[in-house]
């Protein structure tokens, strides 16, 4: 890079050493961290006020507190463990050495107020260029996004095509969040009690060929899967599912999610309201944007922060709580209809954002102009 330096480096924030190298070589850098600006801005507010860190390495601190000096009144019920915040603090500090932050989101979802707050407290610029899931949006693109699905795309589509609009609950907790057998069992009981049709994505190891009935009955009620297959009421997908394709199908009415940012952006882009169940990392902050600020989701009520998303939590969410959260969005109440309408409104805003003249489209043009200026200024220097 010293002999033939690029005009700019776009650096993933998990590689903080890139910023020091770029500064040494006088190469402009842009950061990308995969979070919403709402979350980055909130974490910066916590960091400035010495509220980012927990007092322990392995567990989160309990106890509610209001995030100070933030554009929205956000109450957090715990602080994450040091193992998460220590890394985040390094990442946030390194990002501020870059020439700006690229965000996979659109202005209307994060909100002008959060953008102004971020730029005020950091003196750092952010470019909203998403949602990227709307840029390549054919059925083939949706089916191929991510890893190879363990379920046939054709079979999944055929099953969804047989269902009424807004009748299916999609349940998925990403690729790094794993629940204990006890929690999965309670989840299955909550699904059964809600009496709604569903697609439930579980870890690939669940249901492996050598899994005994005894092992299976630890995480699924006896006969649960067989009854749902027989009644054509639900699908259990082991491993990776074609999520974008599922979310954009008219049969899907709600999404129970761990609040990973990619999942949230994909749901918002599809106009699907969410049942939020955060587990670790930025997910608890993302939940606040979706439920408290934008009103396009309801909370299960999780407050226990995990270190790595694997293993048992101290508290198991009961089937009654899970059923109640599912029914809030799936039972067609007045509250559910208001939430669904707001979700549809944000789908339209997301679609407009990436079209010509939209906020993300214009931000991309602005970023290109800024990159040209950085290149020209470097040449003149």
Predicted regions and their residues:
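Aromatic "clamp/platform" in nucleotide-sugar-dependent glycosyltransferases that forms part
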Residues: 260
């Amino acid at each position: 890079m010293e002999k033939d330096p690029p005009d700019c480096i776009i650096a993933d924030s998990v590689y903080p050493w890139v910023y020091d190298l770029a500064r040494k070589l006088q190469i402009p850098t842009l950061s990308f961290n995969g979070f919403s600006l709402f979350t980055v801005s909130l974490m910066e507010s916590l960091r400035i006020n010495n509220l980012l860190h927990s007092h322990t390495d392995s567990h989160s601190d309990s106890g509610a507190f209001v995030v100070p000096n933030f554009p929205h009144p956000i109450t957090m019920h715990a602080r994450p463990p040091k193992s998460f915040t220590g890394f985040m603090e390094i990442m946030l500090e390194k990002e501020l050495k870059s020439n700006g932050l690229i965000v996979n989101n659109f202005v209307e979802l994060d909100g002008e107020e959060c953008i102004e707050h971020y730029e005020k407290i950091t003196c750092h610029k952010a470019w909203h260029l998403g949602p990227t899931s709307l840029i390549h949006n054919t059925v083939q693109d949706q089916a191929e996004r991510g890893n190879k699905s363990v379920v046939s795309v054709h079979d999944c589509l055929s099953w969804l095509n047989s269902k009424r609009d807004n009748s299916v609950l999609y349940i998925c907790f990403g690729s790094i969040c794993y629940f204990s057998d006890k929690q999965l069992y309670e989840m299955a009981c909550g699904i059964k009690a809600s009496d709604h049709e569903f697609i439930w994505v579980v870890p690939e190891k669940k249901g492996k060929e050598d899994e005994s009935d005894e092992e299976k009955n630890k995480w699924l009620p006896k006969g649960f899967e067989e009854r749902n297959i027989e009644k054509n009421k639900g699908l259990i997908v082991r491993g990776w599912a074609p999520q974008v394709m599922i979310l954009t199908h008219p049969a899907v009415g709600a999404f129970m999610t761990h609040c990973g940012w990619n999942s949230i952006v994909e749901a918002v882009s599809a106009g699907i309201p969410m049942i939020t169940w955060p587990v670790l990392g930025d997910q608890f902050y993302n939940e606040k944007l979706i439920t408290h600020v934008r009103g396009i989701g309801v909370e299960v009520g999780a407050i226990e922060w995990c270190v790595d998303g694997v293993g048992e939590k101290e508290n198991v969410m009961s089937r009654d709580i899970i059923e109640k959260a599912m029914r809030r969005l799936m039972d067609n109440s007045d509250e559910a209809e208001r939430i669904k309408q707001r979700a549809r409104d944000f789908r339209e805003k997301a679609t407009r954002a990436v079209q010509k003249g939209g906020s993300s489209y214009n931000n991309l043009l602005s970023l290109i102009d800024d990159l040209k200026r950085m290149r020209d200024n470097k040449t003149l220097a």
